[in-house]
């Protein structure tokens, strides 16, 4: 029997509190991480910090630019966009602990034709890996606050890869 993700690896790597370290250039430099690596991490990981009672007032004031996610959760379960956050839910987040605040990274969008109508769908790209190797790359198309598989015309879409040397920036 193979469990994926491996429970031990999941416990080590899936906790979103790791993103607080990986998105903090000063802490990475103290740990001896090379500047080119820090630059790559900064480009790919939105600024993330743990939600603590000590930071509650500052995070509440900055909430419109943040997304709040359970540190140990996955998907969009119990995740809240800050500009839609109610004070009651905010109190639950602070009282319950175990959340991170992440700078909002707006998704890209693609125009698609559904039943002869043009529609703009948000998208994200996912790389599914096993044993350190990418097995599948897919796009998820959706409308709304978080990804879902209920959007008309949405769901999974293929991603066509090209060689990096063929890429010419616009």
Annotated model-derived regions:
Residues 1-170:
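Domain-scale recognition of functional cores that engage charged ligands
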């Amino acid at each position: 029997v193979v469990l994926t993700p491996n429970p031990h690896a999941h416990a080590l790597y899936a906790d979103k509190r790791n993103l607080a370290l990986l998105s903090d250039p000063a802490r990475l430099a103290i740990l001896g991480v090379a500047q080119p690596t820090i630059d790559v991490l900064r480009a790919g990981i939105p600024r993330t910090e743990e939600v603590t009672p000590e930071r509650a007032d500052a995070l509440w004031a900055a909430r419109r630019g943040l997304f709040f996610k359970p540190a140990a959760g996955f998907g969009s379960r119990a995740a809240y966009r800050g500009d839609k956050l109610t004070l009651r839910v905010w109190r639950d987040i602070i009282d319950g602990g175990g959340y991170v605040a992440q700078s909002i990274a707006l998704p890209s969008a693609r125009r698609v034709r559904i039943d002869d109508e043009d529609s703009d769908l948000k998208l994200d790209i996912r790389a599914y890996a096993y044993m350190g190797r990418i097995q599948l790359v897919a796009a998820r198309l959706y409308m709304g606050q978080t990804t879902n598989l209920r959007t008309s015309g949405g769901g999974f879409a293929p991603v066509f890869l090209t060689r990096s040397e063929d890429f010419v920036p616009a």
